[in-house]
Design a protein with these regions (language model features):
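Conserved beta-strand hairpin/beta-sheet module of binuclear metal-dependent hydrolase folds
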Residues: 1-42, 46, 126-144, 161
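Metallo-beta-lactamase
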Residues: 81-129, 133-136
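Active-site neighborhood of phospho(di)ester-bond hydrolases with catalytic His/Asp-centered motifs
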Residues: 26-29, 50-58, 78-81, 140-143, ...
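Active-site metal-binding motif and surrounding structural segment of the metallo-beta-lactamase
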Residues: 32-79
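Structured catalytic core of nucleotide-sugar glycosyltransferases
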Residues: 4-14, 56-66, 117
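Cap/insert and terminal regions of metallo-dependent hydrolase folds
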Residues: 150-250
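Active-site environment of divalent metal-dependent phosphoester hydrolases
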Residues: 11, 59-63, 84-86, 124-125, ...
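Metal-dependent catalytic neighborhoods of phosphoester/phosphodiester hydrolases
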Residues: 64-73, 88-91, 223-230
């Protein structure tokens, strides 16, 4: 199974998961050209193998490429009812809304992936994070949340691959050029997790099976990859049991990051 961050950051987000049975995207916030090129490079059947697009929420950096992708490839889109209703024609253009499917409380199955979700704290209509199981493996994903609830922590716990937001360094945000209002929004309850928020949570949601931690949705203005990486690594070194080896990765806005999980057979 392949897990690929095609792009992650404040300018656009898109993740790709694929097995021999099929594939899907989480968010569609970059250009169709980048998505098509990134998917084709992985050799898993290209866009024809994609069974669905899961949306976390309706902000532009998560849906900017959705309209062109739907008009060319006619892929089903899944999200909460309020998220789908909030997709504006001025952003995505005219699309066939018969391709939209509202999530319910049942586990969604795409190819041989099983997908559940938990709601997050962000200034959007009804934002969610996704938890994916494939065979005996689990991938936990959460970005765009100002806080982590107990529900979020439980949903992410015991993941083989754990993708979590490390959006900003608190000092860089405080001392940076953003307006007071924007600083309060980003650092507030309905904003984004900081490096320190992420570092504090990780030891509680990791388990012995966690092999990869992916730091995601970094701000270009208010963070540095090495700052996020070092903050998290210091926390893990202080709190994880000796002998628990985990690879920490920083997802990039421009360069894909690919991880693999082995099959049972």
């Amino acid at each position: 199974m392949e897990f690929v961050s095609l792009a992650s950051g404040s300018k656009g987000n898109c993740y790709y998961l694929a097995s021999n049975e099929g594939a899907f995207l989480v968010d569609c916030g970059i250009s169709m050209k980048r998505i098509e090129q990134g998917v084709a490079a992985l050799g898993k059947g290209g866009m024809d193998a994609i069974r669905g697009i899961l949306l976390t929420h309706e902000h532009r950096d998560h849906i900017a490429g959705l309209g062109p992708v739907l008009r060319r490839h006619h892929i089903p889109v899944y999200g909460t009812r309020d998220t789908l209703d909030a997709l504006e024609e001025k952003v995505i253009g005219k699309v066939d809304r018969h391709l939209f499917y509202a999530l319910d409380d049942e586990v969604l199955t795409l190819a041989d992936f099983h997908i559940s979700y938990s709601r997050v704290s962000h200034d959007a209509a009804d934002p969610v994070s996704y938890q994916i199981t494939w065979q005996d493996k689990k991938i936990g994903m959460l970005t765009d949340s100002g806080v982590l609830s107990d529900e979020n922590m439980n949903a992410l716990y015991d993941s083989d691959i754990l993708l979590i937001e490390a959006n900003h360094d608190v000092d860089m945000l405080r001392d940076g050029p953003y307006t007071y209002y924007l600083k309060q929004r980003i650092g507030g309850r309905f904003g984004h997790l900081s490096n320190s928020n992420c570092a504090q949570a990780l030891p509680e949601i990791m388990s012995a099976r966690t092999k990869h931690v992916v730091l995601a949705h970094l701000s270009e203005q208010n963070n540095l990859p090495m700052c996020a990486y070092q903050t998290v690594c210091d926390a893990l070194a202080a709190h994880l049991p000796k002998g628990h080896a985990v690879d920490v990765h920083v997802a990039s806005q421009k360069t894909p990051l690919a991880l693999s999980l082995p099959s049972l057979t």
